[in-house]
Amino acid sequence: SSAALSSNVHGLQNGNDKVTALGDAYSAEMGKIVPLVDRAEKNAAAVLAQQKTLTQVGTSLRSVSRQSSDLLEVAETVSSLKLQQNAPAAEISAAGQLVMLTQRIGKSANEFLTMEGVSPEAVFLLGKDLNSFKEIAEGLLNGSQELRLAPAKDEQTRERLTALLKMYEETRTQARGILGNLQ
């Protein structure tokens, strides 16, 4: 642990009940090592202080990733229903966008944490894609002049879109927890 490392290095420099000091012959080298160990101990404490938040973010990311595959399945059903109904091109296109957005939401969740830390691009895309998804799904269900979509008329499509929006809310809640912990 960082505490053990710090105790041992400080013991080598000054001596303690477990370690005998190295003496003046090594004071220059110890003068270089001690600040590095102190910084490592401080950084380890900072990470440990964030352990609960980091664990929550990791759990939420896995949840969003899992939920995106469920969203994808329902979005593909909606797209298929629109094709079977010979829906207008705008509705077929919007249903196709839902399919694409579910894939990107999952991808953004998987790319969220990189070796370098949090990916700003993935954070931005996750928030943007979630907003777009809701707008399009609601437009397909209730109609949208802005998106040039008529409200869904058949019961099966309405049922699938309602289920999709319910699943979306669960995903958005998890994502909000992730995005909120980054601020």
Residue ranges and their predicted role:
Residues S1-Q183:
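Hydrophobic alpha-helical segments
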